[in-house]
């Protein structure tokens, strides 16, 4: 039961990240911060 919980969490987080980077190149610096926070 622990497996299905962590799986859906990283999935939605990975989707909004690439979308923001594609739209705004300035999101690269904050992008690294988001990874470190995660």
Swiss-Prot record:
<feature type="compositionally biased region" description="Pro residues">
    <location>
        <begin position="1"/>
        <end position="15"/>
    </location>
</feature>
<feature type="region of interest" description="Disordered">
    <location>
        <begin position="1"/>
        <end position="38"/>
    </location>
</feature>
<comment type="similarity">
    <text>Belongs to the histone H1/H5 family.</text>
</comment>
<keyword id="KW-0226">DNA condensation</keyword>
<protein>
    <recommendedName>
        <fullName>Histone H5</fullName>
    </recommendedName>
</protein>
<dbReference type="GO" id="GO:0005634">
    <property type="term" value="C:nucleus"/>
</dbReference>
<keyword id="KW-0539">Nucleus</keyword>
<keyword id="KW-0238">DNA-binding</keyword>
<dbReference type="GO" id="GO:0003677">
    <property type="term" value="F:DNA binding"/>
</dbReference>
<comment type="function">
    <text>Histone H5 performs the same function as H1, being necessary for the condensation of nucleosome chains into higher order structures, and replaces histone H1 in certain cells.</text>
</comment>
<dbReference type="GO" id="GO:0030261">
    <property type="term" value="P:chromosome condensation"/>
</dbReference>
<dbReference type="GO" id="GO:0005694">
    <property type="term" value="C:chromosome"/>
</dbReference>
<keyword id="KW-0158">Chromosome</keyword>
<feature type="compositionally biased region" description="Basic residues">
    <location>
        <begin position="16"/>
        <end position="26"/>
    </location>
</feature>
